[in-house]
């Protein structure tokens, strides 16, 4: 079997397209997450998350 944990998304968050949020993660109020990000840890309120990507 497997276990699951809820994902909690705060109020007024902006989450870009193709973002992956892993189980058990909490995203604080008024946070912004850029498109294509992979979120593995909790995000504090009023954060801006941009994942660095290399282009080939």
Regions picked out by a protein language model, each given a short descriptive name:
Residues 53-56:
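Conserved switch/coupling elements of ABC/ABC-like ATPase nucleotide-binding domains
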């Amino acid at each position: 079997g497997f276990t699951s944990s809820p994902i909690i998304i705060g109020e007024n968050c902006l989450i870009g397209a193709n973002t992956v949020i892993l189980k058990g993660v909490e995203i604080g109020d008024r946070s912004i997450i850029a498109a294509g990000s992979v979120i593995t840890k909790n995000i504090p309120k009023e954060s801006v998350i941009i994942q660095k990507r290399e282009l080939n």
